[in-house]
């Protein structure tokens, strides 16, 4: 199991972002040039990428999908690159938390919960089920849900 790296940032207050698995695959597998500035902002410390064990484990699992045909070495390289810059968020103690809308895809609910619990500024996703929730009143004052394209323009 890959350990998360504790990362110190020189920025006074980096933007706290949660990246869903599809975005991570674009950044760390395909190295999508359209989104290279997202990765650069994370690696420079301008943005603080946040994950927890459940979200990181989903990334690990998806890297093994046959459709990507990634070697074990390539999977480990992607995990190591992200693991080197992500801040691990430990699960908070059970306390009353702000209510969240329910995502149509139950597997994506963990990203909403992480964004709320880690006090993220943004949840960056290309997932339609998550993007549908972007305008929900329950999210106001908590965090924004943005596409990668929008995250690049809303700096």
Give residue ranges: language-model regions.
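Short, well-structured N-terminal submotif of metal-dependent ribonuclease cores
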Residues: 1-51
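Short, active-site-adjacent cap segments at secondary-structure transitions
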Residues: 24-25, 57, 130-132
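Short, flexible loop segments at the rims of nucleotide/cofactor-binding pockets, characterized by
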Residues: 26-28, 98-104
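Short, flexible helix/strand-to-coil boundary loops that buttress conserved ligand/catalytic motifs
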Residues: 28-29, 63, 134
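Short, hydrophobic alpha-helical packing/hinge segments within bilobed ligand-binding/sensory domains
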Residues: 38, 111-112
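PIN-domain endoribonuclease scaffold, especially VapC-family toxins
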Residues: 41-46, 50-98
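Short secondary-structure boundary segments
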Residues: 53-54, 126-128
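Acidic, PIN/NYN-like endoribonuclease modules and their adjacent C-terminal/linker elements
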Residues: 101, 105, 109, 116-122, ...
């Amino acid at each position: 199991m890959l350990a998360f790296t504790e990362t110190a940032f020189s920025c006074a207050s980096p933007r706290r972002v949660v990246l869903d698995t599809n975005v991570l695959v674009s950044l760390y597998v395909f190295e999508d040039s359209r989104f290279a500035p997202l990765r650069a902002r994370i690696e420079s410390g301008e943005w603080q990428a946040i994950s927890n064990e459940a979200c990181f484990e989903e990334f690990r699992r998806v890297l093994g999908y046959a459709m990507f045909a990634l070697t074990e070495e390539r999977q480990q390289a992607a995990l190591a690159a992200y693991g080197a810059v992500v801040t691990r968020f430990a699960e908070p103690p059970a306390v009353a938390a702000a209510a969240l809308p329910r995502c149509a895809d139950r597997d994506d609910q963990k990203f909403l919960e992480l964004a709320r619990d880690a006090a993220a500024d943004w949840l960056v996703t290309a997932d339609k089920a998550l993007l549908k929730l972007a305008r929900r009143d329950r999210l106001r004052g908590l965090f924004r849900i943005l596409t990668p394209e929008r995250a690049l323009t809303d700096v």
